[in-house]
Amino acid sequence: MLCIYVCGVCLCVCFSVCMCVHVLCVYVHVCTYAHIWTTALHLRCLLPKSFSTLLFKAGFGIDTCVIPSFSMGMLVVFMASMLPTEPPPSPWVAH
């Protein structure tokens, strides 16, 4: 996860990769989503998600299907449907 804080707005970009083996294919799923939100009381994006106001979220994913016997691939780009509606919870909160 990469988080950047600028002038009261926090931008967070997260990546997840999952590999699944099917009968004929090996699927590699890559999901990327980004959050932009504001924190009203803290300057380092460390507030719990209940204190944040979400401004924007977007995501995309890539599914690849590799068929070993033919050495061919299939690429599909889609809008991710499993995006969180709020920033992920902070591992700690500054006092």
UniProtKB/Swiss-Prot annotation:
This is Putative per-hexamer repeat protein 4. The gene is Phxr4.
